[in-house]
Amino acid sequence: MIQSASTPELQTEFLRRIAHKPYFESTLGTHLHLFGNHPASGWAFYLLPGSAVLELRGGSAVLCGALPGGEAGEDAREELTGFLRFLHADTLRTEHPLTLPGWQPAAPLTLWELPKGRTLPLPPAPPAEFVPDKAPSMLPVSRLVFAESDAEADEFYSAACTALAHGVGTCRALLHNGRPVCTVGCYEQSDTESYMAAGVTDPAWQGRGLARYLIVGLANELTAERAVRFACFPALCGFYAQLGFLQIGKIQHYTTDWNTA
C-alpha cells in the first residue's frame, strides 16, 4: 500500500531508501527536509511497496527505488497508476524503467557529474557589460528561468528561496543593466552531492558563452566540498560533454494525458 511519509519514522525510512543514489538523494532528500512537515507547501512524499518512494508536486512525480516483482508488483503498479491519475500527475521521473498503463516513455535524462575535488578549465570571462552576481535577487531570476509560466516561476521562487534561507546551495547570475540574463544555481544538496539546476540564458543573449562561464565556475566552486551532478535532456548532451562533465547514468522520463489514457 502507499503510505504518506508523515511521521519521523516513515521519513527516516524514506531517507534510507534514497541514500547513496545520485540525483535522488540530494533532490528528494532536500525537499523532504524543507517541506516534509508542511503539507500546505504543495509537496507530498510517500513510501511505496518494495523499495520505492514517491515525491509529488503539482503534476510532477519522481519515483526512486523499485516496486516488488510478481503478483505483488502488478498490484503495486495498478495502485500507483490509480494514485497518479487521482492526483492528476502527468510527468514521472524514475530511477529504473517502469511500465504503467497509460504512461508513455519519453527521452530519458542524462545524469552528469564532476567528482569532488575535480575542476574544469574555466571558459573565457564574459565582456565587462555582464556583471557577475553571487547573490542575485531571486524574483527576477525566477522570471528568467520560467519566462513563459508565471505559475512555474512562482513555484521555483518559493522553493529556491526556502532552500537558500536554510543554507542549502547558492545561485549565480550575470546581470546586464541590472537585469539577470543568465543564471545557474544549486538548490538541493546531500552530504556528498550538490545538484545543479535552472541553468538558463535569455534567448537574446545566447551564443555568447555566458552559460559556459557560469556553469563551469559554479561547478568548480561546489566540488571543493561535494560531487556536482545535474541532469539534462538529449539536446544538451553535446554541450556538457564539450565542457568536460562525465556521464554517469540515465533518469527515466514518462508522460501521460489523462484525457486520452
Stretches found by the model and what they are:
Residues 1-29, 108-112, 116-156:
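Short amphipathic alpha-helix that is part of the acyltransferase structural core
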Residues 1-100, 147-151:
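N-terminal charged segments
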Residues 97-107, 212, 234-251:
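Conserved active-site alpha-helix within GNAT-family acetyltransferase domains
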Residues 105-117, 246-261:
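Conserved catalytic-core motifs of GNAT/GCN5-like acyltransferases
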Residues 72-83, 197, 201-203, 207-221, ...:
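Conserved acetyl-CoA-binding loop-helix of GNAT-fold acetyltransferases
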Residues 56-57, 152-200:
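A conserved beta-strand-loop-helix scaffold within acyl/acetyltransferase catalytic domains
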Residues 227-233:
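Conserved hydrophobic beta-strand within the GNAT/NAT acetyltransferase core sheet
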